[in-house]
């Protein structure tokens, strides 16, 4: 009997005790009703019913205390469940942040490895600055940085004046202009014909004819002259320096 009662829940035990109390109370009320109608019940029956009623009431009070205790435990369990849910949410948030940090760290590690590979590759194929400077000098000695407008790739001519072209050009002949003209003036017949003197005539195709046309105005007289520079010695030195640089570049390229 005790084992069967232990298997029942507190709610079932409370309901069973309430049913017993209800039955005993009804019997006790019926006995009181019979005593008023002068129909006495068997002797000792009322005492037995009262004892059972008191016993069931005691059991009911004990069950009520158990139920209250279980209610407090249930409330604690609910509060603990809420706390667990909160902690679980915090753990999930931390897990998400850890996943993001892991992704960032993995990306950083991958980029660092790639940089290390690039550094190792650069170290294996490194070139000293001296070699780069020598190569730049070799390029500058064999190639020009600019060319006349009529020069195209594949042209056998060099895109810059050589030593011979510098000496036979306008700058090289400026020192001889005073000897070819009268008192430093250009020859009158050349000016009258609307052309430059032979000393100023372009000797090579890369020399633009627009330069010569820009020097002579459309209307000129026989007395128009181009005054030579005041210091022929300085001009000769400049031409000599330019010729020396050009010849050195030509020799390097050859």
Swiss-Prot record:
Stretches of the chain forming a coiled coil according to its record: 72-114
Stretches the record annotates as Disordered: 215-254
Compartments, as annotated in UniProt: Nucleus
Keywords from the named record: Activator, Coiled coil, Nucleus, Transcription, Transcription regulation
Molecular function (Gene Ontology), one example: transcription coregulator activity
Biased segments, Low complexity type: 243-254
Membrane-spanning segments: none
Principal location class: nucleus
Pfam families in UniProt: Med4 (PF10018)
GO cellular component term of the entry, any: mediator complex
Record keyword DNA-binding present: no
Gene Ontology terms: biological process: regulation of transcription by RNA polymerase II
Family stated for the protein in its record: Belongs to the Mediator complex subunit 4 family.
Function comment: Component of the Mediator complex, a coactivator involved in the regulated transcription of nearly all RNA polymerase II-dependent genes. Mediator functions as a bridge to convey information from gene-specific regulatory proteins to the basal RNA polymerase II transcription machinery. Mediator is recruited to promoters by direct interactions with regulatory proteins and serves as a scaffold for the assembly of a functional preinitiation complex with RNA polymerase II and the general transcription factors.
Subunit structure: Component of the Mediator complex.
UniProt protein name: Mediator of RNA polymerase II transcription subunit 4
Organism: Danio rerio (Zebrafish)
């Amino acid at each position: 009997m005790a084992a069967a009662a232990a298997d029942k829940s507190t709610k079932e035990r409370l309901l069973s005790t309430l049913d017993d109390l209800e039955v005993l109370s009804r019997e006790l009320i019926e006995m009181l009703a019979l005593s008023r109608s002068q129909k006495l019940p068997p002797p000792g029956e009322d005492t037995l019913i009262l004892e059972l009623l008191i016993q069931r009431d005691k059991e009911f009070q004990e069950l009520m205390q158990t139920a209250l205790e279980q209610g407090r435990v249930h409330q604690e369990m609910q509060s603990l469940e809420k706390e667990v849910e909160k902690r679980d949410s915090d753990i999930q948030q931390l897990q998400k942040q850890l996943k993001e940090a892991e992704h960032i760290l993995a990306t950083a590690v991958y980029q660092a490895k790639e940089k290390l590979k690039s550094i190792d590759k650069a170290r294996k194929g490194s070139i000293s600055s001296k070699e780069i400077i020598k190569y730049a000098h070799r390029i500058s000695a064999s190639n020009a940085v600019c060319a006349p407008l009529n020069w195209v790739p594949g042209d056998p001519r060099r895109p810059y004046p050589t030593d011979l072209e510098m000496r036979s050009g306008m700058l090289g002949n400026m020192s001889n202009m005073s000897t070819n003209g009268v008192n430093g003036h250009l020859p009158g017949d050349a000016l009258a014909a609307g052309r430059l003197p032979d000393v100023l005539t372009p000797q090579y195709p890369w020399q633009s004819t627009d330069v010569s046309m820009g020097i002579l105005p459309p209307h000129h007289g026989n007395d128009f002259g181009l005054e030579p520079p005041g210091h022929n010695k300085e001009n000769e030195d400049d031409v000599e320096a330019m010729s020396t640089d050009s010849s050195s570049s030509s020799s390097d390229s050859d």
